Amino acid sequence: MSWDDAIDGVDRDTPGGRMPRGWTVAARLRAANDDITHAAVADTLPAYAELHCLSDFSFLRGASSAEQLFARAHHCGYSALAITDECSLAGIVRGLEASRATGVRLIVGSEFTLIDCTRFVLLVENAHGYPQLCSVITTGRRAAGKGAYRLGRAEVEAHFRDVVPGVFALWLPGDQPQAEQGAWLQRVFAERAFLAVELHREQDDAARLQALQALAQQLGMSALASGDVHMAQRRDRIVQDTLTAIRHTLPLADCGAHLFRNGERHLRPRRALGNIYPHALLQASVELAQRCTFDLSKVQYTYPRELVPQGHTPASYLRQLTEAGMRERWPEGAPANVVAQIDSELELIAYKGYEAFFLTVQDVVRFARAQHILCQGRGSSANSAVCYALGITAVNPSETRLLMARFLSKERDEPPDIDVDFEHERREEVLQYVYTKYGRERAALAATVICYRGKSAVRDVAKAFGLPPDQIALLANCYGWGNGDTPMEQRIAEAGFDLANPLINKILAVTEHLRDHPRHLSQHVGGFVISDEPLSMLVPVENAAMADRTIIQWDKDDLETMQLLKVDCLALGMLTCIRKTLDLVRGHRGRDYTIATLPGEDAATYKMIQRADTVGVFQIESRAQMAMLPRLKPREFYDLVIEVAIVRPGPIQGDMVHPYLRRRQGYEPVSFPSPGVEEILGRTLGIPLFQEQVMELVIHAGYTDSEADQLRRSMAAWRRGGDMEPHRVRIRELMAGRGYAPEFIDQIFEQIKGFGSYGFPQSHAASFAKLVYASCWLKRHEPAAFACGLLNAQPMGFYSASQIVQDARRGSPERQRVEVLPVDVLHSDWDNILVGGRPWHSDADPGEQPAIRLGLRQVSGLSEKVVERIVAARAQRPFADIGDLCLRAALDEKARLALAEAGALQSMVGNRNAARWAMAGVEARRPLLPGSPAERAVELPAPRAGEEILADYRAVGLSLRQHPMALLRPQMLQRRILGLRELQARRHGSGVHVAGLVTQRQRPATAKGTIFVTLEDEHGMINVIVWSHLAMRRRRALLESRLLAVRGRWERVDGVEHLIAGDLYDLSDLLGEMQLPSRDFH
């Protein structure tokens, strides 16, 4: 039986979905009847517009996407479809796109349930009504916590008092209609209030229809037909029921009245509707739909203009700031080509009307710099000479090849994207500046839509179907990363599940339906939307989970569709590290540097990089990057740009990496079909490694800037099912017309397709390469300050505090060792600090590297406020004894225990056992009367070496004593297990047996199930490659080991060393209770 057969029955004759095999024959017949083609009888069917329909953005209520709903509405011949998600417009832009694709007109609306249980739908009539609806939604959402809303009648009335409503209101009577609710709605909306008659083939439909018509007549309201639609097709009922169970956190079997009685809340064929509703009610829905003339695509958006001083236009002020920036960037005068580029860009920016947007980004960057917050622009904006002149980006246009079309062009529809990184610890200051500058009414973060993935979906679905927790865990593991290319049915069978079991079939079928189904809104990582008018007139605003944060209900794709500009204020840990390192270098070593003034093209720094001595630096610290460095051997800045970009899915999938390396190493000749291509690809040896190069190639062949940008977007969409064939045909024709060989054209197009996977634009890679060089220079020349800054910037990066300290203490042939001193309550501050050493005077007299004193921030369970009290009390006068420390720093029992466990009292009372005893007896030893003799200190033996190391890792996360593997080395020798030093003496291809502490597990998307594991022993790190078949066979050892033993083949090629695993087994028992940090699958 095939996998599709096992999980689902698929009806290919109708748009949209799958029908679980567990359905009855009657259900199948009903679903089939839904989809009878209406072409032959179209003229005899009643017209209809659905005015009450929830999409999947009514989270855990709506079962179908806007795309599915509009496809179904088109199939059924509806004249219009209203998307009316509950107190939300989060899915409305997707509705707009689906409307465009199908030709079914979109009506914008929203459903509400007030605190007194009055239910109604608001439909937008015109441009005046849209901001009214957005404001009502915003009021309800801002009055409640994340994901909820709260609205009363008073709030609704306030929005429509003294204004002409631009919306229609549909009253949704309950099972027991309360006439008073309809009367209230009519008082607020007058003749714009309607009574919605919703019938779902239940026993009392006839009586309900009669009662509602009578009620409408009594109230003087017009009645119309609507469907309370929750799904596109009847077959989706099982999905909708499951969502209901998830929403109520109940098993399906216990949901009872929470579930709908039948599957009628779908988009029904007009024939079926004609058999249920009087023709007049159906016609009334069409007539009201015709009155709703609002077009969402016509929403007008204006960017703030208050940054423009009096006497200036936005264009003139932007030019003034740009020219001032040019003088600062090029004191001797900018090169002529740069001046021309800037003039061209300013003209284009003015043509597109984006001047105020650039001014806003410049203002945010100016604020950050004034507060000494490191920041740097990246992404496609680094193609802009104006951004460089304004200080937004750091890529000098006189030193690199820019392609403005990658960022902005006259024909390009989407708005420009400017990403700016800020120190991750201080980014909140920047966000709050934006809120303060523009007001919370005009600034909010974009949303991110959190969707179900396989593992999260199967957990929720299996729980809804009543599967026991242990079986849920087993089933969820089948969707985990560690399954390689094993077919799903095999994974499930191997986990012990019966694929013939109808319950398992239903769970799996619903899980497949819920993949990529929206689960809830979250906040974007930093994309700010700022408007000249209140944002709630443009899009609803709601509270984020974090305090003092608000988000709009649209995500970045919605913003692009609606042509809204966002400023991306992103957080980058390495900027925090670099700023703290530069402060330490300035304060302790007497060297005053910025990123821009660090000595460039330093041979010693590149030598360190070539040896892959890059633990803790930016971007090139991963195992994959480290494996590339000895092969690529960067010698100059542009090599770092290539290094940043080449270890990405795009170049790997496009088979660009190995040809580039062969050419770089001289194993393959470099040739170009024309001087024009050589100008574009010369620096990358004929291989297109960057998106800009692809765009330049096709522009050179004959594409316009706009067509080249469309190719870029097609590349991004190709992996998601987009069509590249039209581009293949066009590129082949254009390049053949220039005389290029078919082999070259095919090679280039395959490489272009590789960019369908994630790849960096050159501008982005160049921006990141600036930080790569800065962090590497600091690591090479100021290793103590760099390690200290890196520790103080945690959590960030690939490596734990333990690995950072081990690397600093170990040093390398290219880098001095750093002494690290333990945490000490008499000497440590909150942050790690530098002590001793000798300041730098010149390159000839570089001074002496200081030591690092570990800070109290490293102590688990100790808060910064407690440490502030300790440091303040210590500054007043030295602590006389433990009792004095506890009294003057007001240490509670938790803090006392944390200090004792961390060994931070060594200089006061001695070993850990003595510290524990002293802290435990602080209260008991306090004299009852002044002058009473103190109890004599008890001398306790020190813990054994293994116990000390265990306690270090438990309390501080690292140890300055022996490495755990050094303690275990005698046992390793007995087992004939090698250490790194012995391993490095072995020949390439040798069979070896090693073991180490697991510090990282990685599974790149391009690795086809291969797992990369990093082991650590007392001499360094060992890279292990585990093929997918072994990963499956030794899954438990691979995933759960703290101490992993590996038998395999040692390989050493071009300076790259790794171990190909042949077998794995777990030796964690040798570590006892020791828990070690491991960074897994990030």
UniProtKB/Swiss-Prot annotation:
Keywords: Cytoplasm, DNA damage, DNA repair, DNA replication, DNA-directed DNA polymerase, Nucleotidyltransferase, Transferase. It is found in: Cytoplasm. Belongs to the DNA polymerase type-C family. DnaE2 subfamily. The keyword Protein biosynthesis does not apply. GO terms for molecular function: 3'-5' exonuclease activity; DNA-directed DNA polymerase activity; nucleic acid binding. Coiled coil: none annotated. This is Error-prone DNA polymerase. The gene is dnaE2. The keyword Transferase applies. HAMAP family: DNApol_error_prone. The lineage of its organism: Bacteria, Pseudomonadati, Pseudomonadota, Gammaproteobacteria, Lysobacterales. DNA polymerase involved in damage-induced mutagenesis and translesion synthesis (TLS). It is not the major replicative DNA polymerase. It comes from Xanthomonas campestris pv. campestris (strain B100). GO terms for cellular component: cytoplasm.
